[in-house]
A protein has these predicted regions:
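Secreted/periplasmic carbohydrate-active enzymes, especially glycoside hydrolases
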Residues: 1-250
Length: 250
């Protein structure tokens, strides 16, 4: 379930397989034992009122500076549906994203996360961490390898591999003369196509993860703003070592 709004119990063929209490995240349930192969299956999503559920937690008071819809703070759903300055109150409910049945390989990537550890702005050399989690049958460990590829505009920039010996591991890429990601007005927001593949000993690709990655560092340089005028405080974002002027409106 890519999106359930918001409080729901899920049933498959008359069996309760799970529940949802958060509009903002995906929900996945293992239905291996409940699903009937080659037959019709009945999937039911029973929704409960987010308003009624939230009202169970009310204290009976609210700030006159806020909308009188304090039940919204107890439920993980879009708060603007309870009434906002841009639209009237219309509390929604239902499936707001796709529902799909996934058949998963017992040997697969379960999570891939990229983190820029360091950027040398003078040489544009970048150290990129790739944190990987996998699900593998025990006998596959030490026989399967992870292959890492980084490309830009269809051109392969980096390729490497490592043997998988544990369900969670980190791989470090050293990228030379990289195209850095910059915010608007400071340069090109360059993106790379990053791919991780699980490859069996016979060359079979068991699982693939594709993402787009920007190579940059972002820091917040902050000091106490309640200082005398001759020592003003600081609140500044630093991207790739360069102070960035943040502008915009709400």
């Amino acid at each position: 379930f890519a999106g359930i709004d918001c409080l729901a119990d899920i049933w498959l063929n008359g069996k309760h397989i799970g529940k949802a209490e958060n509009m903002m995240i995906e929900h996945a349930f293992d239905v291996t034992k409940e699903i009937k192969a080659g037959e019709s299956n009945q999937l039911q999503v029973i929704l409960r009122s987010s308003v009624i559920e939230g009202q169970k937690h009310l204290l009976g008071t609210f700030s006159i500076g806020n909308f009188p819809s304090e039940e919204s703070v107890f439920i993980r759903k879009a708060p603007h549906t309870y009434g906002w300055d841009i639209l009237p109150r219309l509390v929604s409910a239902g499936l707001w994203r796709d529902v799909e049945l996934r058949v998963l390989n017992p040997a697969r990537l379960t999570d891939v996360h990229y983190m820029v550890a360091n950027v040398d702005t003078a040489t544009r050399n970048v150290r990129l961490y790739t944190d990987v989690q996998v699900k593998l049958p025990f006998e596959k460990f030490d026989k399967v390898k992870a292959v890492y590829t980084l490309s830009r505009h269809g051109k392969e920039i980096y390729k490497g591999s490592s043997v998988v010996v544990s369900p969670a591991f980190r791989y470090i890429m050293e990228i030379k003369n990289a195209d850095l990601w910059w915010p608007r007005g400071y340069g090109e927001p360059a993106l790379y196509d990053a791919k991780v593949e699980l490859v069996d000993s016979d060359g079979t690709i068991l699982s693939t993860d594709n993402k787009r990655v920007g190579l940059r560092t972002i820091q917040l340089d902050i000091t106490d703003i309640n200082l005398p005028p001759d020592h003003p405080g600081k609140f500044c974002f630093i991207v790739n070592g360069e102070p960035i002027f943040i502008h915009g409106t709400n």
